[in-house]
Regions:
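Thiol/selenol-based redox catalytic cores and closely related redox-interacting motifs
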Residues: 33-130
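Local sequence-structure signature of Cys/Sec-based thiol-disulfide redox active-site neighborhoods
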Residues: 1-24, 28-33
Length: 130
């Protein structure tokens, strides 16, 4: 199974998702989207595959900032903003053959991977997930 994580190493949730995958025996393809940026096609594919709307895909501050564009359903302007400001996309997104999930909370990752780490599994902040 091919597993891809759209990863922000500055985010504890993203680091936890990556650790969870590797502890599960999965070596994911890591996409450092802050460095590489987003493409129009990537954003549309994530939105479609995750069944999320723009408000759910955005960090809270970006969602507030882009609210007029979201209400106007101005997808082109929203995507252009996200291409210019990749940090505005919520994280982490994980993609497998079973689907795409915004892994907030981290437990959303479980239904799209074939195995999980041994229990107990703790986040870097000490919260038990399994």
């Amino acid at each position: 199974m091919v597993v891809t994580i759209y990863h922000n190493p500055n985010c504890s949730k993203s680091r936890d998702a990556l650790r969870f995958l590797t502890a599960s025996g999965i070596e994911p393809q890591v996409v450092p989207y802050l460095e590489e940026g987003w493409s129009h096609d990537q954003l549309i594919a994530l939105k479609t595959a995750s069944s999320l709307d723009w408000t759910e895909m955005l960090r809270p501050d970006a969602s507030t900032l882009l609210k007029p564009l979201i209400i106007a359903n101005d997808e082109v302007a929203i995507i252009n903003y996200l291409i210019e400001h990749p940090e505005a996309v919520e994280r982490p997104f994980v993609q497998t053959d079973k689907g795409v999930r915004l892994c907030r909370p981290l437990t959303r990752i479980i239904d799209i991977i074939d195995q999980t780490p041994e229990s107990p599994w703790l986040t870097e902040k000490g919260k038990q997930i399994l």
